[in-house]
C-alpha cells in the first residue's frame, strides 16, 4: 500500500463524561485490534423485536441477532452499540449478511446487532413504501434495544448505526429523514402505513445517534439539515451505477454527504475505490477491514479527536498506535514551536538523528528525513500535517499534529 494514514489518538482532551473517558482508554479496546478472542464473544440469535404487516398484508415477525463481549470476561458493564442493516434493494438479503462486521465489532468491545426487516413491494411507487417500512423497522429495533439495554450491556448514550446499500440508505434515513419530511414527500404515507415511532412494537424509548457507518449508501435530497448532521465514515465505489457516489435524481450519495458534512464542520471519513462499482471490500477480509476502520472512527469520536479523511487507497485502520515514549530515555514532555509554523519547527524532547516522516491530512507521505535541530516546512503547502518521530534506540514512537500557515 502506497499510503499510510496516520489518523490516531494524538491528544486525550479533558472529558466531562466519565463513561466517554472510559471508552477513550489507553488500551486497545475500540481500535482495529481484536481485543476479545472469538471465544469471548457471545451472541443471541433471532431475538424478536417486533412484528408488522408486510406489503402482502401478512404479519411478519421482526428479529435481530446481537453480538457482544462475554459479560463474564469484559470488565465494562455498558458498551457502545452499533446497529447494522443489510442491503438487497429492499427486496432481498437477510440479517446474517452483516454477521462478519458484527462479530468483528464485538471483538473490539462493541455491542453489535444486525436486523431483519420487511422486504418487497409490488410495482411503481410501492418501492417507496418498502423504504419507509425499512425505516419503521430500524426505528423499532432501536427502541427495543434501548429498552433492553441492561440485558445486553448497552450504553444508550453511545449508539451508532450502519448498513450496506439499501441498509445504508435506511441508516441515513433514521438520522436524516423525519416523519414530517416523509409526509411532505409522500402525502398519506403515515396514514397508510403507520408512524415511524409506533410501528413494530409498543416501546416508546427515544434514541440519539452519534455516528453513521455508511457503505455505498445515500440519503434523500433535501433531507440533510445542518442541525441533524453527525459524523460519518463511508465506503463507496467511484463507478457505482446503482447508488451514485455523488448526487443523482433523488439521492445524495456518499461523496456528496461527505462534502456536506465538511462544509458544516462535521467530521467525515470516506474511502473511495477508484475502479469500484456497487459494493467494495465485500469479502470477509474486506468486511473486517471496513469494521476496523469504523471502530477507529467511532473511537475518535469518544476521544474528541475525529479527523476528516478522503482517500482512494485501502489504508488499514491504525488507531492502536497511540503515543509511546520510554520515560527514562527521553524527557517527559515533548513540545514543538512555533505551531502553526511557516518556516522552521523546533521540537524539544526529540534527540537528533530520530527518523521523521511527514504526512499530509489524507495520508500522502511528503518527506522522510532525520531530525537535526529543526524541521523545515517552507517547501510544503498550507494545511494540516502529521509528523511521526521514530527512534527505537530510545523508545520513541510519537506523532505530532502541525499546522502549516
Which functions belong to the PLM regions below?
Residues 128-150:
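Alpha/beta-hydrolase active-site loop
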Residues 143-228:
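Primarily recognizes the serine-hydrolase "nucleophile elbow" in alpha/beta-hydrolase
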Residues 264, 306-337, 354:
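Residue-level detector of functionally pivotal "anchor" positions at catalytic/ligand-binding pockets or at interdomain
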Residues 328-405:
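C-terminal outer-membrane/trafficking sorting elements
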Residues 23-76:
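N-terminal cap/lid segment of alpha/beta-hydrolase-fold proteins
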Amino acid at each position: 500500500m502506497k499510503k499510510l494514514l496516520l489518523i490516531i489518538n494524538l491528544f486525550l482532551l479533558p472529558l466531562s463524561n466519565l463513561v466517554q473517558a472510559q471508552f477513550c482508554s489507553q488500551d486497545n479496546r475500540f481500535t482495529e485490534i481484536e481485543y476479545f478472542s472469538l471465544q469471548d464473544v457471545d451472541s443471541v440469535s433471532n431475538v424478536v423485536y417486533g412484528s408488522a404487516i408486510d406489503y402482502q398484508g401478512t404479519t411478519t415477525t421482526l428479529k435481530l441477532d446481537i453480538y457482544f463481549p462475554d459479560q463474564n470476561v469484559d470488565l465494562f458493564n455498558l458498551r457502545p452499540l452499533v446497529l447494522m442493516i443489510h442491503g438487497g434493494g429492499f427486496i432481498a438479503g437477510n440479517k446474517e449478511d452483516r454477521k462478519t462486521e458484527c462479530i468483528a465489532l464485538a471483538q473490539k468491545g462493541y455491542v453489535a446487532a444486525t436486523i431483519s426487516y420487511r422486504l418487497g413491494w409490488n410495482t411503481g411507487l410501492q418501492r417507496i413504501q418498502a423504504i419507509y417500512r425499512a425505516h419503521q423497522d430500524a426505528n423499532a429495533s432501536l427502541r427495543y434495544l434501548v429498552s433492553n439495554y441492561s440485558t445486553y450491556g448497552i450504553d444508550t448514550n453511545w449508539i451508532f448505526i450502519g448498513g450496506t446499500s439499501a441498509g445504508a440508505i435506511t441508516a441515513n434515513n433514521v438520522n436524516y429523514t423525519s416523519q414530517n419530511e416523509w409526509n411532505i414527500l409522500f402525502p398519506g404515507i403515515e396514514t397508510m402505513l403507520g408512524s415511524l415511532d409506533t410501528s413494530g412494537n409498543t416501546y416508546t424509548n427515544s434514541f440519539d445517534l452519534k455516528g453513521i457507518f455508511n457503505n455505498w449508501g445515500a440519503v434523500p435530497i433535501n433531507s440533510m439539515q445542518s442541525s441533524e448532521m453527525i459524523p460519518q465514515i463511508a465506503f463507496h465505489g467511484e463507478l457505482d451505477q446503482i447508488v451514485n457516489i455523488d448526487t443523482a435524481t433523488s439521492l445524495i450519495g456518499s461523496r456528496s454527504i461527505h462534502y456536506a458534512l465538511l462544509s458544516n464542520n462535521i467530521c467525515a471519513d470516506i474511502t473511495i475505490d477508484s475502479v469500484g462499482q456497487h459494493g467494495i471490500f465485500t469479502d470477509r477480509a474486506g468486511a473486517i477491514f471496513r469494521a476496523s476502520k469504523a471502530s477507529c472512527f467511532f473511537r475518535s469520536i469518544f476521544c474528541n479527536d475525529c479527523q476528516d479523511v478522503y482517500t482512494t487507497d485501502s489504508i488499514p485502520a491504525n488507531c492502536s498506535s497511540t503515543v509511546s515514549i520510554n520515560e527514562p530515555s527521553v524527557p517527559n514532555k515533548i513540545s514543538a514551536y512555533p505551531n502553526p509554523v511557516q518556516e522552521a519547527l523546533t521540537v524539544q524532547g526529540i534527540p537528533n538523528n530520530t527518523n521523521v516522516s511527514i504526512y499530509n491530512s489524507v495520508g500522502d507521505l511528503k518527506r522522510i528525513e532525520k531530525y537535526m535541530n529543526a524541521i523545515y516546512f517552507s517547501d510544503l503547502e498550507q494545511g494540516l500535517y502529521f509528523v511521526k518521530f521514530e527512534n527505537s534506540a530510545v523508545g520513541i514512537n510519537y506523532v505530532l499534529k502541525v499546522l502549516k500557515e
